[in-house]
Amino acid sequence: MKEVQCISNVDNFLIVDKKLYFSNGKEVIGENGHSILISPLSLQFLNYKEPYFYIPDIYGNTYLIMENEVRFLKDIFIKDVISDSLLLVSKDKKTAVFDIKNNEFHYVLNFRIFKFLEWKKKYFLKNKNNIQGIEICTGQFLWEFSLSLLGKHKNPYTDEVKDFEVRRLIGIYNNILWVFLNAKGFIGLDIETGKLKYRIPEFHQAIGKTITSSYEDRKGFFRSDYLLDNEKGKIFGLGVDVYIEIDLNQEPPFATQYGLQEEFEKYNVKGNDTAEDYVVQDNLLYFSLFNQLKFGVLDINTKEIIYISEPIAVVERDDSFTQLKDLKVSENKVYILDSNDTLHIFEREKLNFEL
């Protein structure tokens, strides 16, 4: 890997169709440095779902970036793009379907939604202590699963007894909705009925060494942005120096923890600051060590770390400690944003990472 470009004043960024788009907090910049949008108010995160880009400002308005125009949607927060004419939005502390061609709202829920998953014109969402299934355009409830049915859990470090909560709606495989809970466990719900089909409170098998062996909750799952690979039928995630893989093709699903301590030690690195988010492309998992200012690549087939970079050159500031805060991959390029708002672009010249 070699760094081929460095762009300053980047607040957040996206890669769409192999092209870089980013916001500097006041402006959205497209390919070749072309300005797409300038806002008088501070902007938040740039989003994309075909066919639109959209970005909210700090006051709850949203800019909808269309092919031939930019529309300012006052007091409207876009949650999702349903089609080229329909948006799912938050307005007046409620959830509505907004017809952008006819400028009409149809309220479907009397509350705002935050964590949700769209699948075949249905939404699966978290509402307080429940997981619900609804039809998108009508708001009709299909089912509801109460997390209270799972009982309570005890924090292994404080002995505090707490309710279960949804940390992440991961995805759907074979008509099962997979959910990661705050107590570091997984549940699988039937998407037609909402009934609990599977519960995985801890992994079944451990392979390899890990620096987490002394942890009180050592059979639990670490916080991570777990991903579902529908082609392989597997859920996987990375936390600290642990790689988790859940095989959904087995009955019941089987969870394996792979300790990567020795893999990290090959590069004289400790895997104690791996970021929760990562990217998987062509059986390679790209991750960052956010405090060590490095990034690496794990082969998820062999469970071997095949590359770890040298520390990324950053400009330190007197008032803060620089970290890596975002990583994206597009074909042979790796994009890494640091906390000083500098985007570093690396190019991979060989698949075996010999450079």
Feature roles, as predicted:
Residues 1-355:
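Secretory-pathway ectodomains
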